[in-house]
């Protein structure tokens, strides 16, 4: 069985700041890795999802952020998608796209998780499968300052799916940065700490002052705090200011569900977060750069950013919200 192990930290941050100890929370680093071909019902990035054959595959009907030349491509997009959907529609009539060119393109499967692999995600009663799909083109939602792929979440009971949709459509036009490579997840349970901006202000300043001293020896709290990469856990690896959206139903603050990340570590944080089992760096890449297998999923969100998914478990249907942050 494959595994990934986060290296022991080079320093004990709680010895320096004891107030952090009670703030530690369990996190699951998902560690997507290429090389294997997980089946339709397995936890993974990309590939064929466990999607019911009698359920329409989602098609995007939301306007895309695009230049004028991209708008002119919509006619070609619809023609190519009609060709792609022709043989599929013969077998799966319920999966036909809407007429009159209303859908702009097919969604793609991004992340699928089984409760058996990551119960920490928290599943609705009677469900054992989580699926995240998105439209792999940019969407501009000015009302909440979002620019990126349009996301949808599905919760399922896998035992009720008797026939899987084998030919899952591929969009004719897409941003290649939003098309995931097929990866297997290798979940790892760790303990991490809140992002510095989620800490009390007085503690923030003490940490920043420590970072300026010789005793810090180049360490910064931003490396050992919230684990980066694709993860499940209460402590969020924020790139910008922390922001938990209000639930669209009850207006109360939602909780972090899942982070979809461009990178698992970078040239500064790899000493803390590059798993011990990773193979030697290839192509003579200097170790201090740390740029090797940290982006196996092949996703780039803005300037190497993250999409954060949030859920409200208080309201029926568990409403979902999401945002994208990048540097």
Where are these regions (language model features)?
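Preference for intrinsically disordered or flexible, low-complexity segments
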Residues: 1-327
């Amino acid at each position: 069985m494959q595994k990934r192990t986060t290296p022991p930290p080079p320093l004990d941050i709680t010895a320096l700041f004891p107030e952090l100890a009670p703030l530690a929370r369990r996190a699951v680093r998902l560690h997507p890795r290429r090389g294997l071909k997980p089946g339709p019902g397995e936890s993974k990035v990309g590939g064929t999802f466990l999607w019911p054959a009698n359920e329409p595959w989602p098609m995007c009907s939301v306007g895309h952020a695009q230049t004028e030349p991209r708008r002119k491509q919509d006619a070609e997009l619809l023609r190519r998608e009609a060709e792609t959907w022709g043989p599929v529609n013969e077998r799966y009539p319920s999966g036909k796209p809407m007429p009159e060119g209303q859908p702009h393109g097919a969604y793609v499967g991004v992340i699928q998780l089984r409760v058996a692999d990551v119960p920490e995600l928290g599943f609705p009663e009677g469900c054992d499968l989580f699926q995240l799909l998105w439209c792999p083109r940019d969407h501009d939602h000015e009302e909440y300052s979002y620019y990126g792929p349009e996301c949808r979440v599905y919760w399922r009971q896998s035992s009720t799916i008797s026939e899987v949709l084998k030919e899952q459509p591929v969009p004719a036009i897409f941003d290649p940065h939003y098309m995931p490579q097929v990866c297997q997840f290798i979940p790892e349970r760790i303990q991490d700490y809140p992002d510095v901006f989620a800490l009390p202000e007085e503690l923030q300043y003490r940490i920043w002052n420590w970072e300026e001293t010789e005793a810090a020896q180049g360490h910064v709290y931003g490396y050992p705090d919230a684990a980066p990469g694709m993860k499940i856990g209460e402590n969020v690896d924020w790139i910008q200011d922390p922001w938990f959206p209000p639930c669209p139903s009850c207006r109360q603050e939602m909780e972090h569900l899942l982070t979809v990340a461009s990178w698992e570590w970078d040239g500064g944080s790899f000493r803390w977060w590059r798993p011990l089992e990773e193979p030697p760096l290839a192509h003579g890449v200097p170790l201090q750069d740390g740029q090797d297998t940290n982006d196996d999923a092949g996703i780039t969100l803005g300037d190497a950013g993250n999409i954060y998914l949030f859920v409200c478990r208080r309201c029926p249907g568990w409403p979902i919200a999401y945002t994208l942050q990048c540097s």
